[in-house]
């Protein structure tokens, strides 16, 4: 009942997610004494985002028997499951500054956004399905093995303070994996933290963190009007349509964060809305996912109001399956 009330209260406190895990903490001693062990690996990487994928490719190319473990059902992390709409700048303003695998993946991904100029290096749109296929191909061609829908659950340490095994939860139950080298590419530092590495949460003594966002996409927009009409959002420019929607007071879940990119014919992808979330609390993250989807719907309603020429026939085609966590 308390959890349902907390979800219902979110509309009254937009963007603020309270931690509820403290009320639920009780102990249970596991009776299971043995689980299966897979100990054939040279390198085990936890997390299949850009860092995990490139680490897996590099290790496998050097001949290491490599396993890439990913909690979701796709590689790419925030660029695919998280639906971040564009690459951050790849240049110093004149020339590309990221080489090797990063440049190769970036160049390949541009084939999935044919409307982008070939020489563009900064804020290039991402087609998440196309990018996903690139990671699948490059990782598997390198010889690395991929295990999807498998989440790190625990870390077993040896007496000399090194990792003895990692425990993963998936459809087979709890499974232990052993390797000679372990790489933490979780994005949250889970493997390192659960191995006993020290860490600091947040950017101040109170543990404050940057706000999170849930990305989403709109389909059936008017691309011509989107490209040639007024810019939807410019930071601190209150003449842009988004500020008009916020000032109206009709859309309490909409704030002045609305980065957006055309990712295909009549489809834009948006990094929009802010939520203050304890990103170490699974209950808070769960509530943020619900609130993020509500925000996506309300952003569309707001855009239909202030920019009907672009959005009158649009609909929410997808919301991300991974929360955009900045801290």
Please place each PLM-identified region on the residue numbering:
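N-terminal Rossmann-like FAD-binding beta1-loop-alpha1 element of flavoenzymes
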Residues: 43-64
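Flavin (FAD/FMN)-binding glycine-rich loop and adjacent Rossmann-like elements that form
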Residues: 30, 34, 105, 149, ...
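Ligand-binding pocket scaffold of soluble enzyme catalytic domains
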Residues: 51, 80, 172-175
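Soluble non-cytosolic domains of exported or imported proteins
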Residues: 50, 125-130, 286, 290-293
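N-terminal export signals
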Residues: 1-19
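Loop/turn elements at helix/coil->beta-strand transitions in domains of secreted/extracellular proteins
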Residues: 40-42, 62-65, 142-145, 175, ...
């Amino acid at each position: 009942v308390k959890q349902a009330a907390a979800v219902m209260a979110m509309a009254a406190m937009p963007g603020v997610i309270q931690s509820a895990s403290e009320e639920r903490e009780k102990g249970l001693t596991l009776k299971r004494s043995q689980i299966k062990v897979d100990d054939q690996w040279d390198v085990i990487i936890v997390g299949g985002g850009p860092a995990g994928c490139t680490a897996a490719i590099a290790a496998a190319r050097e001949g290491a028997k490599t396993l890439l473990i990913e909690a979701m059902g796709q590689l790419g992390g925030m660029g695919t499951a998280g639906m971040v709409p564009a690459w951050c700048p790849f240049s110093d303003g004149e020339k590309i500054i990221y080489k090797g695998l990063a440049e190769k993946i970036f160049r390949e991904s541009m084939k999935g956004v044919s409307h982008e100029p070939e020489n563009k290096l900064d804020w290039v749109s991402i087609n998440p399905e196309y990018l996903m296929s690139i990671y699948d191909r490059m990782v598997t061609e390198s010889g690395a093995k991929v295990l999807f829908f498998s989440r790190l659950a625990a870390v077993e340490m040896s007496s000399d303070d090194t990792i003895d095994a990692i425990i993963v939860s998936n459809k087979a139950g709890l499974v232990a994996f052993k390797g000679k080298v372990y790489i933490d590419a979780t994005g949250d530092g889970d493997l390192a933290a659960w191995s006993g590495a020290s860490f600091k949460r947040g950017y101040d003594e109170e543990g404050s963190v940057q706000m999170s966002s849930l990305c989403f996409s709109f389909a059936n927009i008017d691309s011509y009007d989107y490209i040639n009409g007024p810019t939807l959002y410019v930071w601190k420019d209150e003449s842009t349509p988004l500020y008009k929607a916020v000032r109206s007071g009709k859309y309490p879940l909409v704030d002045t964060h609305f980065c957006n990119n055309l990712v295909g014919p009549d489809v834009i992808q948006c990094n929009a809305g802010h939520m203050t979330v304890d990103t170490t609390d699974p209950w808070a993250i769960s509530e943020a996912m619900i609130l993020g989807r509500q925000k996506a719907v309300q952003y569309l309603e707001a855009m239909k109001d202030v920019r009907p020429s672009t959005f009158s026939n649009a609909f929410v085609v997808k919301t991300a399956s991974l929360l955009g966590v900045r801290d």
